[in-house]
């Protein structure tokens, strides 16, 4: 049973130091007991210390405040809100932010080094092993059962977005409220979490974030000379202001929170706009999709591996168009090296891991990160069932004919995986992930904005731009009729163009207003297309007939 402090409190502070769970907080002369931390001193004392020591009998059994909470009006002025366009926001995306995101999302599966004073350390080599980046976390007061929640990485990315809006983040700070966090994470529409539970989670996650220490030893890189950043906070908590509301008995109830955070010293070298122009520092930023934050908050419990991949791919896709990712690499990110090694030795664990991995890939596909399987190393026989079922037509009659044809071929579509599927998966690759539109929108705007970069650097940046989806590609030719129409499009041309654009047969059929079986028959050469269909295909695939195969 939890307790609360009534208006009879005389302010003797006898209860504050004696509370074993540190649930009692004093702010501006107001006393408040966190009901989620107060446990009646169970396991510490035979009776609650606040009750036994209080001379005025102020502590009373906790009762939730009835009615709606009043709107908090006396807040500290917060920083400008994020995601004003409703889709994305620029955020600091340097290697410090990336590795800290990995540290938070993969905490329970990383090979961490234990240090004295109950600390764990994560170290990453940089600059061809000439430098290092070290993250350290003190575990005092953090439960061992679930020390770090993957959702903490979402707040880390929100902090990085706030930091990107500061001119000199190592000298400035940003202010935000619990209501803003709820809107970013999609909690403003959820009814399954009480207000007190949300506030307690925010307090826990932000406390964990501000405990992380980062130290950097960076070698020379281009015009930027080597530098060292001594151990300091990744994010420094300057202030956390609690907003209370009193009930009829004079007991305080927490109804809101406001934080002031200052980015660490690392931003002087990785988020320094002026220093970047002078060749003395880096200024690295990218686009943070709002949908990513809300997807993590929705799927973290049942698909934690998929959410780890989602957070990792947010940074990985910035490194080039053709990032051929092996299945073992993705599994290490999603489940950790230890579980992967266990699967090598245990048949049942292999089966469970493959099922989990294919389910997590499906979650990413539904989100909009569509994997493109390498046809040589990742053939359809070992692809997930959901990927193979995309070939099934939506029309009932066509679907019936499709299944009849598949049955005549031995039921290849739904057949069990081949013998030795695990070994084949360990050699399989995913060529790339096609991105949803909100992942690419900011990149397109950045490419169009004027910069001071040299031509060669701009060309390198263009080569490493993220992969766009169909909606982000340039429009079709202004007048497709100008293309020569003397030679009919070949099925191989259509299939190659469709695969190059990352479009499935079903998507192409929807664009053309045709059935999926019609597209399949055209690509297989069983149907000849009319001039009208040919022009519509050119529009859909932006295909130049002058580049057809001979």
Regions found by a protein language model. Give the residues of each.
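Ferredoxin-like iron-sulfur electron-transfer modules
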Residues: 1-11, 22-46, 58
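Short basic helix-loop element that most often maps to the first helix and adjoining turn
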Residues: 9, 14, 492-511, 536
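Conserved hydrophobic/aromatic packing and binding residues within compact polymer-binding modules
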Residues: 24, 494, 508-509, 519-522
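Recognition helix of helix-turn-helix/homeodomain-like DNA-binding domains
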Residues: 37, 346, 513-528
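DNA major-groove recognition helix of helix-turn-helix/homeodomain DNA-binding modules
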Residues: 57, 532-547
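Charged, alpha-helix-forming regions
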Residues: 65-489, 500, 506-507
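Residues in the helix-turn-helix
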Residues: 356, 507, 518, 528, ...
């Amino acid at each position: 049973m939890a307790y609360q402090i009534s208006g009879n409190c005389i302010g003797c502070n006898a209860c504050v130091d004696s509370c074993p769970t540190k649930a009692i907080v004093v702010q501006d002369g107001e006393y408040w007991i966190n009901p989620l931390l107060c446990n009646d001193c169970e396991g510490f004392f035979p009776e609650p210390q606040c009750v036994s020591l209080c001379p005025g009998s102020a502590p009373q059994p906790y009762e939730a405040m009835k009615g709606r909470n009043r709107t908090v009006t006396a807040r500290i002025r917060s920083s400008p809100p994020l995601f004003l366009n409703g889709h994305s926001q620029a955020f600091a995306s340097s290697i410090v932010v990336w590795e800290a995101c990995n540290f938070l999302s993969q905490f329970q599966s990383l090979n961490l080094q234990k240090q004295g004073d109950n600390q764990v350390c994560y170290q990453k080599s940089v600059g061809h092993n000439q430098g290092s980046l070290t993250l350290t976390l003190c575990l005092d007061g953090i439960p061992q059962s679930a020390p770090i929640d993957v959702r903490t990485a979402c707040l880390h990315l929100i902090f990085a977005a706030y930091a990107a809006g500061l001119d000199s983040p190592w000298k400035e700070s940003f202010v935000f409220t619990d209501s803003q966090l709820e809107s970013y994470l999609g909690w403003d529409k959820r009814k399954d979490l009480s207000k007190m539970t949300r506030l307690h989670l925010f307090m826990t996650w932000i406390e964990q974030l501000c405990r992380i220490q980062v130290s950097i030893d960076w070698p020379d890189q281009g015009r930027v000379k080597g530098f060292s950043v001594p151990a300091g906070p990744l994010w420094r908590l300057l202030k956390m202001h609690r907003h209370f509301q009193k009930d009829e008995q004079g007991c305080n109830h927490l109804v809101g929170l406001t934080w002031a955070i200052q980015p660490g010293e690392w931003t002087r070298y990785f988020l320094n706009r002026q220093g970047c122009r002078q060749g003395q520092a880096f200024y690295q930023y990218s686009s943070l999709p709002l949908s990513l934050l809300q997807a993590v908050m929705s799927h973290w419990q049942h698909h934690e591996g998929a959410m780890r991949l989602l957070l990792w791919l947010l940074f990985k896709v910035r490194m080039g168009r053709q990032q051929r990712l092996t299945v073992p690499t993705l599994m290490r990110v999603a489940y950790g090296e230890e579980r992967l090694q266990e699967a090598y030795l245990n048949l049942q664990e292999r089966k469970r891991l493959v099922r989990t991995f294919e389910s997590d890939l499906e979650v990413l596909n539904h989100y909009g990160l569509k994997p493109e399987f390498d046809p040589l190393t990742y053939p359809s026989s070992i692809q997930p069932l959901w990927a193979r079922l995309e070939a099934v037509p939506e029309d009932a009659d066509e679907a019936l004919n499709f299944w009849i044809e598949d049955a005549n071929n031995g039921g290849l579509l739904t057949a069990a995986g081949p013998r030795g599927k695990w070994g084949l998966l360990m050699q399989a690759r995913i060529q790339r992930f096609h991105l949803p539109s909100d992942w690419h929108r900011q990149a397109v705007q950045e490419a169009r904005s004027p910069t001071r970069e040299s031509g060669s650097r701009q060309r390198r940046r263009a080569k490493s731009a993220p992969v766009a989806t169909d909606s982000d590609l340039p429009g079709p030719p202004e007048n497709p009729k100008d293309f020569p129409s003397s030679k009919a499009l070949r099925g191989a041309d259509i299939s190659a163009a469709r695969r190059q654009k990352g479009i499935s047969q079903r998507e192409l059929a929807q664009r053309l207003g045709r059935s999926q079986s019609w597209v399949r028959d055209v690509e297989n050469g069983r149907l000849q297309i009319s001039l009208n269909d040919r022009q519509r295909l050119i529009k859909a695939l932006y295909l130049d007939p002058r580049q057809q195969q001979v």
